[in-house]
């Protein structure tokens, strides 16, 4: 009985998110039943960011394709998202700027460096969505991009419709999420971690930083940290390497 109304509600929420300015869309979306919470010190982080020539780098776990969007809404500030394997549909419909990474380490490093010079950046080092109660291995590239990294623990809660874990279209994540009557997103800012923006030649340190950020997020969410890669995930669940 919910599905017909849910489809109408989902379409309404997506149209609002895509067409209304952020300051107006946030209260309207909340009125439709969407809830989001944020813990941490966003005001202090905003002030620190304004004093630096480089934007803040937010590193978060990857629950759904909506992660960067809800972080932007929670902080009430513009963010640019860098992501792997983003479909053209998701890229075109995203209400925040998105930049596609190539899995070429040197090229991706230059892309992220350029984006940080223009403003705040959010990256999901797992490289793919993971909806279970564990974290995939964090790629260490983000640890080399900035001296100051803000780990963010993200989680989503829905009651009826869930996004796919392995196969299927990831661009349908927003559809499944917004079909739910009262979906919830939570974000927890976990302070600031020292990155390697000025000391990239220290071999091995980037892995320590990446693992430390993973542990911080895992402890905050109560998730288990693993060394599984995105390739491991797709080989086990779908029998392929998950290349889009």
For each feature predicted by the language model, list its residue ranges.
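A hydrophobic membrane-anchoring feature enriched in long, contiguous, low-charge segments
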Residues: 1-19
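Short amphipathic C-terminal alpha-helix that caps PH/PH-like domains
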Residues: 208-220
């Amino acid at each position: 009985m919910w599905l017909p109304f849910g489809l109408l509600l989902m379409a309404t929420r997506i149209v609002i998110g895509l067409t209304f300015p952020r300051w107006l869309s946030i209260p309207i979306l909340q009125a439709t039943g969407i809830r989001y919470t944020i813990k941490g010190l966003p005001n202090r982080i905003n002030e620190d960011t304004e004093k630096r020539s480089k934007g803040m780098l937010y590193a978060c776990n990857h629950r759904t394709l909506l992660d960067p969007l809800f972080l932007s809404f929670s902080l009430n500030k513009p963010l640019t998202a860098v992501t792997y394997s983003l479909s053209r549909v998701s890229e075109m419909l995203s209400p925040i700027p998105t930049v596609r990474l190539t899995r070429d380490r040197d090229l991706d490093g230059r892309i992220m460096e350029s984006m940080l010079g223009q403003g705040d950046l959010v990256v999901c080092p797992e490289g793919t969505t993971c909806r279970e109660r564990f974290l995939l291995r964090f790629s260490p590239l983000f640890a080399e991009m900035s001296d100051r990294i803000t780990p963010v623990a993200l989680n989503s809660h829905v009651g009826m419709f869930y996004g796919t874990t392995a196969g299927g279209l990831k661009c349908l994540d927003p559809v499944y999420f917004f079909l739910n009557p009262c979906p919830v997103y939570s974000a927890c800012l976990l302070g600031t971690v020292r990155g390697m923006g000025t000391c990239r030649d220290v071999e091995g340190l980037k892995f320590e930083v990446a693992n430390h950020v993973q542990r911080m997020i895992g402890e905050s969410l109560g998730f288990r940290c693993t060394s599984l890669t995105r390739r491991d995930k797709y080989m086990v669940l779908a029998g392929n390497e998950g290349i889009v």
